[in-house]
Amino acid sequence: MIQVTVLVDSKQQNCGILISGHAGYAEAERYQKGQELVCAAVSALALNMANSVEHFTDTPFQADMEEESGMFCFRFTQEADAKAALLLNSLIFGLLDIQEEYGEPYITICYKEV
């Protein structure tokens, strides 16, 4: 299962995200290796968000990814500008859509104040 934790600051603004695990969707649906749809979608959305924040905004952040474990950490290191906040919120929106489509056996999303 993929576990997503959205980090929320004291102003109730999303300020980061932690993603870990593997969905197991391919195994459950008897797909062949390489057809892990849920993991691929989550990875594509997360990496696109981080690359977009870097390319299109001036908001500093820290990011780390471990391919084998499926771990992805992203956090703004100062208050996000409007563009950066929109990109993070767009990622969260996409992850919520994946959760709605494929269900909680494959992806869970929670929020944590930091």
Feature map (PLM): residue ranges:
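N-terminal intrinsically disordered, cationic/polar leader segments
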Residues: 1-36, 47, 51-114
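Short, surface-exposed ligand-recognition loops at beta-strand->loop->(often short) alpha-helix junctions
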Residues: 44
